[in-house]
Curated annotation (Swiss-Prot):
It is found in: Cytoplasm; Golgi apparatus, trans-Golgi network membrane; Membrane. PROSITE patterns: PH_DOMAIN (PS50003). Its main location: cytoplasm. The gene is plekha8. It is a peripheral membrane protein. It comes from Danio rerio. This is Pleckstrin homology domain-containing family A member 8. Residues 203-219 have a biased composition (Basic and acidic residues). Gene3D superfamilies: Glycolipid transfer protein (1.10.3520.10), Pleckstrin-homology domain (PH domain)/Phosphotyrosine-binding domain (PTB) (2.30.29.30). GO terms for molecular function: ceramide 1-phosphate binding; ceramide 1-phosphate transfer activity. Residues 299-309 have a biased composition (Polar residues). It holds the Pfam family GLTP. One of its GO terms (cellular component) is Golgi apparatus.
Length: 549
């Protein structure tokens, strides 16, 4: 659809006729139909904007992207406005339906993947329980004493466990990078810990024929063999994170082996420290082997069901303790830090890194200017609309200058110096003039926020003082009247504070005031420094103007 609509330009020029074209979900406007070949003067995406119908003016419709773009439009009559509303609503509905469909598909895929992750964790629990049961059963001891058959069985079980645990750990790391890490940070109820797996119970040789020291060495070699079989020869090179996770898993298994083997080596090590006859050493060794066999029989005689219940009870207790500690830690963090509007801004003056000779990066500065516009909305979206329109209009004038030759205007100073050189700096609607009014508007906001930061709770008084220090001297009686009306409609201190939080009710928390002072103490000095640099530049080239509008 296309046609003529009246667009609000500023509080001096008022409503001006423009040629509008709605195509492909984008509304673009031109000076006139004849000048359309020159390119559009501006555009707005219908899918992301709010379409607001004026409550009293039956010819007006507003298109708003909060904090970014504002199109205030009027049709020739109510019937014409209705046509545009139908066209705009249809375009928005079509685009929204497609976007909703994509979001729904993404959500369904996410839920399906989460379900698969839960199943994977269940399979992990079952495998760990089965391995634990096999290791605790008499069959494991019998097969361990059967020579090569026991050696094969032991290596196979250990290799399978190591490979499965490593693969499972890799899957969990991938999932944690894809979704919220908290999803995988806790062990589900009933999941046996890795420490319950006791690889040393499956012996590769008869311990009666080996010295205790050789038994320990053989176990370590067996562990190394199984790790080698499931290692890099059969799998792609792991990432650094996978190396770390594998190292932790292997070190945990080795610690369990050492803890259970060292008591058996204690007597042998003390025996080896002294020179004694060979017969005595053999006698001591046979005695130790007999004791060790009795201990193993006692362990085997334990009920697998009883062992499983004890493991589950221990894990459940640890899980509850970890959850309690996590909740307490989260509560402490929530009390210490409260997000404010200034800590969650997409772009901030305090994040701008100046270039050589205090050069202010153009795009970063303009993005920070766009990001502070919502403060005017929080003061009053209706009464401050003319101020906001003028503020955003100046930003766009500078943006158009940058778009014309981005490489030539990396800093604000380069724009001003270029226009000074070409003698267009003081021409009406030049980028230099737009920057002049933009920095005046920023000074107004800085003075107002500075008063609020010092503890002033009279929002209307703070606005009046800031206006008197910055903009009032450049305004005639008409514009002063507009500002006076806006100041009288300013919100209360509590209402303004409530608009500066990310979550409703945060303004009542103890950490909110501290967070607000913390954020403004960082934000305002950086803003003041950059405005001071611009003031110095304008004074140096005599670009300041006392003209009253």
């Amino acid at each position: 659809m296309e046609g003529v609509l009246y667009k609000w330009t500023n509080y001096i020029s008022g409503w001006q006729p423009r040629w509008f074209v709605l195509e492909g979900g984008t509304l673009s406007y031109y000076d006139s139909q004849e000048d359309a070949w020159k390119g559009c003067k501006g555009s707005i995406k219908i899918s992301v904007c709010e379409i607001q119908v004026h409550p009293s003016d039956f010819t007006r419709v507003d298109l708003i992207i909060p904090g970014e773009q504002y199109f205030y439009l009027r049709a020739i009559n109510a019937a014409e406005r209705q046509k545009w509303l139908v066209a705009l609503g249809t375009a928005k509905a079509c685009l929204t339906d497609n976007r909703t469909k994509r979001e729904k598909e993404l959500q369904e895929n996410s839920e399906a993947l989460k379900t698969k992750m839960s199943e994977l964790r269940l399979y992990c629990d079952l495998l760990l329980q089965q391995v634990n049961k096999i290791q605790e059963s008499p069959l494991a001891e019998t097969s361990a004493g059967s020579g090569e058959g026991g050696d094969e069985t032991g290596n196979l079980v250990k290799s399978t466990c190591t490979t499965f645990l490593k693969t499972l750990e890799e899957c969990m790391h991938i999932a944690s990078r894809t979704f919220n890490p908290d999803l995988l940070s806790r062990t589900p109820p009933g999941s046996p810990s890795v420490a319950t797996i006791k690889p040393q119970k499956i012996k590769s040789n008869d311990p009666k024929n080996l010295h205790p020291g050789e038994t320990r060495k053989d176990l370590i070699n067996t562990s190394g063999t199984s790790a080698h079989e499931s290692g890099p020869d059969n799998e792609p090179p792991p990432s650094p994170q996978e190396n770390i996770s594998t190292a932790h898993t292997e070190s945990g298994l080795m610690e369990d082996q050492n803890d259970l083997i060292e008591p058996n080596n204690g007597s042998s090590s003390s025996t080896q420290d002294h020179e004694e006859p060979v017969e005595e050493q053999q006698t001591d060794g046979s005695t130790e082997d007999a004791d060790h066999s009795q201990e193993e029989q006692q362990e085997v005689s334990m009920s697998p069901t009883q062992n499983k219940q004890e493991v589950q009870e221990d894990i459940q207790t640890d899980l509850e303790l970890n959850e309690t500690q996590s909740e307490n830690k989260q509560e402490e963090e929530d009390e210490d830090k409260v997000d404010t509007f200034f800590s969650t801004m997409s772009h901030r003056f305090s994040d701008i890194i100046l270039e050589e000779d205090s050069g202010i990066p153009t795009q970063a500065f303009l993005d920070s200017c766009y990001a502070i516009v919502p403060v005017l909305d929080k003061l009053g979206p209706t009464v401050f609309a003319p101020v906001k329109i003028d503020f955003v209009g100046n930003i766009k004038k500078i943006q158009q200058k940058v778009v014309s030759d981005p490489e030539s205007f990396p800093t604000l100073q380069s724009i001003v110096l270029h226009e000074v050189k070409t003698e267009v700096a003081q021409v009406r609607n030049s980028a230099t003039e737009a920057l002049l009014w933009l920095k005046r508007g920023l000074k107004f906001l800085k003075e107002f926020l500075s008063e609020i930061n010092t503890g002033v709770k009279d929002v209307q008084g703070a606005l009046y003082n800031a206006y008197g220090k910055t903009l009032r001297q450049y305004h005639g009686w008409v514009v002063r009247g507009v500002f006076a009306l806006a100041l009288r409609a300013a919100p209360s201190y509590e209402g303004f504070m409530a608009a500066l939080v990310s979550y409703e009710g945060d303004e009542l928390k103890e950490g909110f005031r501290t967070g607000m002072h913390r954020d403004l103490d960082i934000y305002l000095p950086a803003m003041e420094n950059q405005l001071s640099i611009l003031d110095t530049l304008y004074e140096e080239y005599g670009l300041e103007s006392d003209e009253i509008v």
